[in-house]
């Protein structure tokens, strides 16, 4: 019969950058692993991470997540981690080459969209390759969103 499905504790969004899709035109997304310490994983599982002001950069053939905030794990005492340290991202060589090429040549930006745990319980970062929107682009997006809402209301009233 109908079984009630429990939410999988592993497959859970921990932090989301909701302003990224408003401020950037997202052209491509890619999933990257994160190199974390034990206390960082425990802190992530508590769900208090923040990636609003963070970005990724290519340095020396490696990609780093910069300015992300993972609060200290309270039970860790002196073995705690630095909350705003740079974290290395795990990608294939081909993926790294593609991202570094798009950042260097085309002037794109690497923007983190969300941090989540996958089915195996590993922390992953959804990374977007995007171009910054100008003010008029943001206004145009907002107009389109308002019009689609209004259109939905009109269709709902008639139908």
From Swiss-Prot:
Gene3D superfamilies in UniProt: 2.40.280.10
Originating species: Mesorhizobium japonicum (strain LMG 29417 / CECT 9101 / MAFF 303099)
MF terms (GO), sorted A to Z: RNA binding
Function of the molecule: Required for rescue of stalled ribosomes mediated by trans-translation. Binds to transfer-messenger RNA (tmRNA), required for stable association of tmRNA with ribosomes. tmRNA and SmpB together mimic tRNA shape, replacing the anticodon stem-loop with SmpB. tmRNA is encoded by the ssrA gene; the 2 termini fold to resemble tRNA(Ala) and it encodes a 'tag peptide', a short internal open reading frame. During trans-translation Ala-aminoacylated tmRNA acts like a tRNA, entering the A-site of stalled ribosomes, displacing the stalled mRNA.
GO terms classed as biological process: trans-translation
Region spans: Disordered: 137-159
One cellular component term from this protein's GO annotations in UniProt: cytosol
Domain of life: Bacteria
The protein's name in its UniProt record: SsrA-binding protein
Positions in coiled-coil regions: none
């Amino acid at each position: 019969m109908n079984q009630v499905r429990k939410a999988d504790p592993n497959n859970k969004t921990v932090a989301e950058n909701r302003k990224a899709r408003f401020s950037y035109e997202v052209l491509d997304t890619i999933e990257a692993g994160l190199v974390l310490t034990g206390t960082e994983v425990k802190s992530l599982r508590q769900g208090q991470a923040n990636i609003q002001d963070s970005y990724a950069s290519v340095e020396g053939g490696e990609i780093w997540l910069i300015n992300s905030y993972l609060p200290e794990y309270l039970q860790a005492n002196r073995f705690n981690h630095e909350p705003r340290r740079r974290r290395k991202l795990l990608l294939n060589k081909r993926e790294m080459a593609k991202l570094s090429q798009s950042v260097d040549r085309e002037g794109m930006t690497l923007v983190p969209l969300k941090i989540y745990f996958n089915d195996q319980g590993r922390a992953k970062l959804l990374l977007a390759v995007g171009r910054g929107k100008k003010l008029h682009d943001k206004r145009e997006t907002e107009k389109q969103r308002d019009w689609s809402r209004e259109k939905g209301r009109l269709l709902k009233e008639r139908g």
